[in-house]
Amino acid sequence: MKGWVNNVKKNRFEIDMCNGSIMDKLISFSLPLMVSGILQLAFNAVDIIVVGRFSGSQALAAVGSTTALINVFTNLFIGISLGANVLAARFYAAGKDREMSETVHTSITLALISGIMMAVIGVLLAKWALEIMGTPDDVIGQSALYMRIYFMGMPFFMLYNYGAAILRAIGDTKRPLIFLIISGIANAALNMILVILFHMGVAGVAIGTIISQLISCVLVLTCLYRSEGSYQLRFSKLKINGAYMEQIFQVGVPAGIQSTVINLSNALLQSSVNSFGSIAMAGYTAANNILGFLYMSVNSITQACMSFTSQNYGVGKLKRMDKVLRDCAILSISIAAVLGGLAYSFGPLILTVYTSDPKVINCGMEILAYTSITYFLCGIMDLFPGALRGMGYSAVPMVLSVIGTVGTRIVWVFGIFPNHRSLSVLFVSYPVSWIITIVLQVVCFYFVRKRVHQKEKRLL
C-alpha cells in the first residue's frame, strides 16, 4: 500500500504529496488556493465597495454587520467539509477506490442536505439573530433583508465548498481557482448592474452573490461528473453511507464546532463594536475585510498542511509529515509577516477604497494597528490543528482552540473592555488569544505526535 502513490498516474491538475520535494509542492498547492481565497474576498470587497459608495454608509454597515452571523451559521457545515477532505485524501493516497467513491457521494449528499437546512434556518432567524447582537435600528432592516436573500443560496454555496474539498484532497487547487474567477467576474458584473444601474442596494448585492454561487456550484459538480477514476461523481449514486459519514464527522464536526464557536466570539466582538455606533461598525467592516485577505493567505497554508499530512499519514510516511509542518510554518510566518506589515503601512490608502469618511478610516486603522502586524500569530495558531486533523485528531484541538481563543475573548469583553472602552482595548484581545492558543496547541501536538510515532513503531 505504501508504494501505491509511487505508481499512480497523475493528471495535470493533481499533485503527488507523498514523494519528492515538499516546499515546491506546497507552493504549487497553496498558491492557487491562496489566490482563490484572495479573489473570493476581492469579489466580496466589490460587494462592500459598491454598496458603500453607491448606497451609503448605512448600507455598508448593514452588510458588514451580517458577516460574523453568517459565519456562525455556516461554519459548522463548512467545517464538516474538512472531514471530507481529510478522509478523501487518505483513501486517495492509499489507492482505496471504493472507499474514495463512497466518500465523494456521501460528502456531496451531505452538502445538499446541509445547504437546504441552512437556507431555512437563515431565512427564519435572520432578524432575531441581528436583534440579539444589538444591531442598531437604522441598519437592522437592510441587514435582515441582505441575510435572508443571501441564505437562499446556501445549497449552491455548500455544494461548491464540498466539491472543492474533494478536488483539494487529490491535490487539485487549480480548477477551483478557475471556477472562482468565472463566478467572481459574474458577481462583480451583477453588482454593477443591480446596485448601480437598478439601485437595488443590499438586495442587489445579495442576489448577485446567489447567482455567482450557482455558477461555481454547477462548474465544480460538472468537473467531478466528468472526471475519471475514484473521485468521479454519479448523481444516481448520491446517498449517505453511515460508516463514511461517521468518519467524516469525526474530523469535520469538531472542526466545524471550533470555527462556529470562534465566530460566536467574533460576533460578541461585533456586538461590542456595535455599541460605538454605525461609524465604528463601518470601520470594522472595512478593516475586517482587509484582515480577511490575510486570513485567506495563511489559511491556504493550513489547508495544504492538512491535505499533505493526511495523504502521508495514509501511507505511513511519518517523518515526511514533520517536514511538511516545518515547511508550512516557514511559509505561513513569512507570508503573514509581509502582508500584515503592508496592510498596516498602506492601511489609510486601502481603507479609502471602501469609504471616503475620515472617521470611518480612523476606526479602521485603530483596529488594524493591533491585528494586522501580529497576524503571523494566527497563522501559527492554525497550523498545528491542521496537522492534527490530517492525522485524524480533531476533538482535542477543537477544545483547546475554544479555551484559548473564545475563552480569552469572553474574559476580555466582559472583564477588561467595560472598564477601558475603546476599539484599541477591544482588539488587543486578538493577539493575546492567539498566543495563548498557540501554547496549548503546541503542547497537544507534541503528545499526539509522540503517540502516533510510538504506534507506528509497534506495527513495524
Located regions from the model:
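Residue-level signal for short hydrophobic patches within transmembrane helices
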Residues: 19, 23-42, 46, 69-76, ...
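Helix-terminus/linker motif at the lipid-water interface of multi-pass membrane proteins
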Residues: 42-61, 130-137, 193-200, 260-293, ...
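Small-residue hotspots at the loop-to-helix junctions and early N-terminal turns
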Residues: 55-68, 147, 206, 278-293, ...
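Hydrophobic transmembrane alpha-helices of multi-pass small-molecule transporters
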Residues: 72-75, 187-191, 217-221, 293-296, ...
